[in-house]
Regions:
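Polyanion-binding loop/helix "lid" in catalytic or ligand-binding cores
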Residues: 141
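Active-site-adjacent mobile loop/cap segments within catalytic or ligand-binding domains
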Residues: 145-189
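N-terminal catalytic or cofactor-binding beta/alpha core of small enzyme domains
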Residues: 1-138, 149-158, 187-198
């Protein structure tokens, strides 16, 4: 019996993708006339626009992650280092524009929950130079990453959160390839939505 897939509930979890700085180029993931953004197998892309107001953007991203349909967040931005793409592995408890701790009661370091080793392997397989970096660059991306990680529930089903940094001079094609590689790696670890919540 043939079943029209368009009539079935979409059980793919959402993967939020955010280029946090609106001054960065917007790497367009809309590839055809449908107007729908590219989505990796097993997930559906939820684009979230960047904002120069980093605290407000962090609030919006945290709110998105609290939605039961959203299972992952990929932050995208620039690195201050020359050379390869960088997958940031941790964020420090640090204020955005001044010295001191952002959260007096929070952990000093928060580690990403995304599958870094697999993301790195997929970047390399796509022909892109890439490293996993333990240093937390002092910028809005690290601030937003810490905010999102520190707000995660202590649960086995916590969202997958990662941060991809591109070097200056990365081409639009390289950016699209990198985003697709890491998003696909993240999506492979996501669980389909329960039937009761699928739209």
């Amino acid at each position: 019996v043939d079943t029209d897939s368009r009539t079935r509930p979409d059980r793919r979890p959402a993967l939020a993708i955010c280029v946090w700085n609106p001054d960065y180029p917007t790497w367009d993931l809309v590839e055809d006339l449908s107007g729908e953004p590219w989505s990796p197998p097993g997930a559906r892309t939820q684009p979230i626009p960047g904002d120069t107001d980093s605290p407000a953007l962090a609030d919006r991203l945290i709110a998105a992650l609290k939605d039961q349909d959203c299972a992952a967040l990929l932050l995208i931005g620039r690195t201050s280092h020359p050379g390869p793409f960088r997958l940031q592995m941790r964020a420090e408890n640090r204020r955005l524009d001044s010295a001191g701790r952002l959260d007096e009661t929070g952990p000093g370091v928060a580690r990403v929950t995304a599958p870094i080793a697999e993301m790195l392997r997929d970047l390399t397989a796509a022909g892109l130079p890439a490293i996993a970096a333990s240093d937390a660059e002092e910028d809005a991306g690290s601030y937003i990453l810490y905010r999102a990680l520190a707000d995660l529930p202590d649960s086995l089903n916590s969202p997958s959160i990662g941060l991809l940094r591109a070097p200056d001079g990365a081409t639009e094609e390289a950016m699209r390839t990198a985003i697709k590689a890491v998003a696909s790696a993240m999506a492979r670890h996501l669980t389909p939505l329960p039937r009761s919540s699928a739209a």
